[in-house]
């Protein structure tokens, strides 16, 4: 029997070995192939010595799954989940278990990527289209986005849209009603300052007294009052004011739509539709506008088009509005949105149907009526005389009420002016109303819920005025009226899932996206009620588990990045960029250098960089790259010197977007610092840094971290994400704060960038688990394996395709770029053809035409085994052989497996296929691996031009689905 130590038998590194794809023997085989003795040797060949860390991370040792779960369970138990009546945009909800199990906890839904390859994403595209239909029906407007990050961010986007489209071109004032949620006003003010807009806050009716380009109103407002704005909106629109409305999605089920009142833009949080509060997120925001504003909409929009067979097919529409194409001229910097949560909300609407939603909304309103009637019967005065779910009470002994509430384990809303608010929700029961009477009135009140209900039924309720009762039908499309049984709902979800390719089927090698394993053990805590059901504005002493988790995660990220502090608030990488640039902006202002507003950005940068710089009020100056893809130092020096007086910063990605460690990165930092600028190092490629180098060690001042890339939060088909920023000490006082929650930091009073103080805190346990389980050694080994996998793929493919950029010792970092331009010139086969042909082989295409047009960028990550890498390599080699047949004239350039890809079942069943110069087997079973595990695209190649020229972004007739 082999003698093993107890430490070996305890297998503390078991999670590490399961997270990393290649086992030790495969790693050695791959190392031998690429010409390295060990992972450390390979690292030394790739990473410049000048930036290589000489010491290990100080995260701690790796641990087993059971140990990690036990530790985080202890943190969860420190959270006190009181019954929340705080409201303010966050409400208790009942997540239907059929959605919880089959969507939220299903890797077929949460590991997919943004549907840039729509032919293999028709399932979630349909679910998102349903979300858009829900949004349009409830708001009464024409065109909805596929989701934004949160309600407050959506408000800022609405303000920006208003300025873009308003005919009041000379106006520079945006009016905000003084009864909006405070966190919404906070985020709007932050964005307005960057744009140079003036924000005027006042009673809603005073909006007409100002020269405005736009105005924002809350429906219902923070106190619960619901108002008919029809006349006010008409008066404002007559003055060319763009009217925007923050609306409650559940209230809209019963209320007259803002669109019917004359609103131009309506937005809000879809959290109430079956998504837990999660201490602030993640939640999908809906955003809907009039059709005339469609070209100015922010974010993704799903539209209906057709494929090459003329069949209905869905795709992302009007992408020319977005950051990856328009860069600093984009409508928004939005990249990652909240697709997983939007899908949950859409399925919630599908499962309940219109009648089920009306029942839920009516129950919430009835309980609110009962609560109000009982309190008023006892002489309690209310601030509001109309309501959907919220009443605000004045004249109470606030201290006594608060003491009784805490003793009863409930949280109410306590405003600074002595008003006490109570917001009810889907989870409210009769017993909760009894408990609220006890807390607000004290014992012995004698009120009876059943008697009060009978009184309301007999007398009728006036809480929703007749003029504000919705008269039009909602959700009439058959999709919302046929899946109310759980069996049918389960099958509908499965039917959509089967149309999509996600990580649970095959590798997704998207460069710059880091589609690594999202381990099941990392995902488990997210569903626990101790994490899922916390209100973000609850007293912090009730959230000790969350607080400790955030502090531990922040300290680990500080160690990994080499920075001094971390701000968790940003909800995505793009929002992290915006937050980091704001910190730089405020830093310069604090030094009397507000004129520093120029941001240098290499021409190879991701589109979010210039878009974020524009949002932060900066002017973009592009610097050149040399033929090797590196920053042209001479051009950088010249431009830095030229704009030195006004230089704010540089935004640079490391390793570069070309997939190499630039040797001159420290010199780049020094050049910018010498001219008074700051260095923003984009953390998109952090998966090639962890444990080997760090932004702080390199010389940067601030970075965002994509927790949904490097730190294992799943991409969710296009969100959620997290983009916390790490900063050097001198920038720490200038990171985002929050108007509601102030934990006692120097940055507390700064403006917010997100609605919640800790952003999408509900998914932070995923990254916490990832780091805790891997430990210092595991994090470093993961990075090294990512380098190994990328260089193995690069060397294998270099025998068949030109590799565009390489660094020292002919190596790449964690990703490589293959150049398809010579192939296109010789054969007519395009990068699009190759991307779609990969679908036939069961793969999602790598990143296409970024950072160089006519290329594919491949990032395999550390989680893919040698077996899967070889399967992908074999597919690419086989495709190269197919291209050779086109080059040789064996297959026509306009009729071959690449040009016609992807192939569907309908293709091979069609007798017309016999006229093609290749067989059905070549079309759909091009490799042995595919024969035993076939993924079938459900549509042929989609016509993008047709989709944009014939824009249609709502649910189509059911016959088109069947």
From Swiss-Prot:
It comes from the Bacteria. The keyword Transmembrane does not apply. It holds the Pfam family GDC-P. The modification N6-(pyridoxal phosphate)lysine is found at residue 709. SUPFAM superfamilies: PLP-dependent transferases (SSF53383). Gene3D superfamilies: Aspartate Aminotransferase, domain 1, Type I PLP-dependent aspartate aminotransferase-like (Major domain). InterPro entries: GcvP, GDC-P_C, GDC-P_N, GDC_P, PyrdxlP-dep_Trfase, PyrdxlP-dep_Trfase_major, PyrdxlP-dep_Trfase_small. Its cofactor is pyridoxal 5'-phosphate. GO terms for molecular function: glycine binding; glycine dehydrogenase (decarboxylating) activity; pyridoxal phosphate binding. Keywords: Oxidoreductase, Pyridoxal phosphate. The keyword Oxidoreductase applies. Its EC number is 1.4.4.2. It catalyses: N(6)-[(R)-lipoyl]-L-lysyl-[glycine-cleavage complex H protein] + glycine + H(+) = N(6)-[(R)-S(8)-aminomethyldihydrolipoyl]-L-lysyl-[glycine-cleavage complex H protein] + CO2. One of its GO terms (cellular component) is cytosol. GO terms for biological process: glycine decarboxylation via glycine cleavage system. HAMAP family: GcvP. The glycine cleavage system catalyzes the degradation of glycine. The P protein binds the alpha-amino group of glycine through its pyridoxal phosphate cofactor; CO(2) is released and the remaining methylamine moiety is then transferred to the lipoamide cofactor of the H protein. The glycine cleavage system is composed of four proteins: P, T, L and H. Belongs to the GcvP family. This is Glycine dehydrogenase (decarboxylating). It comes from Shewanella sp. (strain MR-4).
